[in-house]
Structure formats: C-alpha cells, structure tokens
Amino acid sequence: MNLFYNLGISLYSAAVGIAATRNNKARLMKAGQAQTFGILAEKVDTSASYIWIHVSSLGEFEQGRPLMEMIKKHTPEKKILLTFFSPSGYEVRKDYPLADVVCYLPMDKPSLVRRFLDAVKIEKAFFVKYEFWGNYLSELKRRGVPTYIISAIFRPTQAFFKWYGATFRRMLGCYDMLFVQDEESRALLAGIGVDNVVVAGDTRFDRVTDILEDHTDLPVVESFSRGAFTLFVGSSWQPDEDFIIPYFNKHPEMKMVLAPHEISEDRISGILTGLKRPAVRYTKTTPEEAAEADCLIIDCYGILSKSYRFATVAYVGGGFGVGIHNINEAAVYGIPVVFGPKYGKFKEARDLIALEGAFTVSGGDEYALVMNRLLSDGEYLKKHGEFAGGYIRDNLGATRRIYDAIFK
C-alpha cells in the first residue's frame, strides 16, 4: 500500500493506544492484539494449512458462521483460523468450537502482516462484508493465496467509486472473487472495471434459519408471553426506550419483552424506573412469576434470537444511533418488524420496508400510529408478518452458492 495509507494505519493504531487509557473497548483491542502472536505460536499446527475467516465484529461473525459450518460439515478435517477486529465480536466468540484458532487481527502494518502470514499457512482467505485491509490483501495476493470477500455490499458513497479512491480500488483487485449481496453492488463494481463478481446473497439469511430450527427451552419467556399480544424490543438504546416505554405504560392490552443492547445495573435500573407496570428480570424470576408480570427485561446475553419465536411484533433498536441491529432474527418468525430511521445501509431493511414486512418510525407519534394498527387489526398484523417471513425464505442459499463456487 502507498505511504498515505500506511500513515493512516499508523495514526489509527496510535489513537487506539491513547484511547486504551480510558476506553474499555480500546483497552481490550490493544491487549488482545498483543496476545495474537502468542496464541498463534501455541495453537497453530505448523504442519497443516488453514482456511482463514476474518470478520470485524459479532454481526459479521454471524455472516461468516454459516460458511464455517458448511466447511466443517463437508470437510471436517479442514482447519479454520478465525480472526476478529473488534472486541465486541472476539470477547463473545473467542471459544467458538468450529474454529481451531481464534484471535485478534493485528493492525494492518506491513511488518505485522508479514509476521502474521508467516505464522500460519493459509490455504484460502475469506473476508466478510466490509473488511478491506490493503496490506493484508496485497500480501495475500503476492503469496498466491486465493482470497475472497463474502456477503459484501457496496454503495456509491464509498471511496472505491470516488475520484480519490485509486488506493481502495487496488484492494478490490486482490480478490479472486467477490461474492456480493445484490445486483446494485455488482453494477457499481462493473462500473469501475471489476467483473469477477457473483451475486450470491447474504449468508445471514442461512444463519437465521438455523435459529428458526433451534427449539431451546425458554420456560420463562414462554410462560410470560403465552396467550398475550407481546412486543419484543431487541437491542434497544435509550432513544428507542424514550417512546416505547411510555406507549407501553398506556396500553395494558399488550405485554413487552425488553432486551437492552448494553446490559448494566444502571441501564436496568433506569428502565425499571420508567416502567409503570409490573416488571421482572429474566435472571431473577420464575415462569410462574413471569406469567403474572407485564414486562420481562432480558438482563443477560445469548437468548434474544431464540426468544423472538414468542413475539407478536418485534422492535429492533439502533435506528436512532449508528444503525439498526439484526432484524432478520425477528423477521424469520413471520412477524412484523419495527425500527428507527437509520437503516439505509442495510439492504434487508430497505427490502422489508418495500415489501411491507417492516415499518420505520422517526419518533413516538409515528410509533404510536404503527402500533395502534398492529394492536387493533389482526388481519393486518398477520398479513405484514407473512410478508416478513416470506422475504427471509426467498433469500436463502447464499452459503451454498459460495461453497459450491469455491470448494466444488
């Protein structure tokens, strides 16, 4: 990569180091990257080759996961190296059983890149969705390692398509194949001369069908929601709750499960203060107590996606911040999904709105209009839920298309 790119990486690395003195996420990243080469020395089988899957965070992990599962299903002898950029992915999935080695990806500095690739014999490399690291890509190409990006999605606003984007366009030339989510991405790439592109779809759809088939017993959630119109609020933030909770307080004909994105005693306490109806916490209640409550607060991680099967309607948070969280996990159950206005980067959100399987709201007034109709009109509720579930079913198969193109 050129001098300016490498300077940018060095400045970013320095910024992480400074932030680590006061920010826990940066602290975890810095400490985790410092452990990477020790993990590789301890766990890598130097006589074997590895399929390398790199993801940024937890959401991208869920896109890479179906491919890892398919690789292990058909070729269990293959070894997988899984790397993360963000602590929010690594800290949750560092013990993922299908990966033989899991670690942080070192910063994209030439010396670290060479050291990393010298430590592991890479058979094939897969980057997921948005991961474009110029030094890794150019070094993989120089070494002749087949390299792919999966579930990628491109937008006209990205640097690849700007007059100043030559450095970033060169990165695209390092991929043997780009598997994109939609035709719009393929057309954008064709416009800059990139034609080794396959419209395969989004592997996350295949992941959510696995969730659909997971019948883990959740007696507290099941007992709480039985026979009631139950709104599930997933991965909520304060701006979401500012209008969801007041509406809930005024509508005794509904129940609510609320799962905040960040769980802390302060967050839970604030939610409980705002609620004017009986509420219980998931970790501190029984099925019998939950059945008598009006609101169930999910104060632990790992059960939200499985819990949506008990929902009547889902609201997915994040739409008043950096962007909405995973809406497919709810839509797969054939229920309408509601979210805030910052959804433009997410193809599935745009598609679901166009198909009327989802609704976007910009505040409390619009939210009330949507919820009033869903609460009062059973046929309307059923119809829009069917639109959501049908969209998920129609978009299955990306993992198989990618696997067959590379491994068959």
Which residues does each PLM region occupy?
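A short, well-ordered alpha-helix in the C-terminal region of glycosyltransferases
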Residues: 380-394
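C-terminal alpha-helical cap of glycosyltransferases
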Residues: 395-408
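Active-site and donor-binding regions of nucleotide-sugar-utilizing enzymes
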Residues: 17, 21-214, 232, 237-238, ...
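Short alpha-helical segment that forms part of, or immediately flanks, the ligand-binding pocket
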Residues: 305, 328-332, 350
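Acidic donor-binding loop of glycosyltransferase active sites
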Residues: 120-124, 291-322
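Nucleotide-activated donor-binding/catalytic signature segment of Leloir-type glycosyltransferases, i.e.
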Residues: 93, 97-101, 269-298
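Structural loop-to-beta junction motif characteristic of Rossmann-like glycosyltransferase folds
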Residues: 145-146, 312-313, 332-341, 357
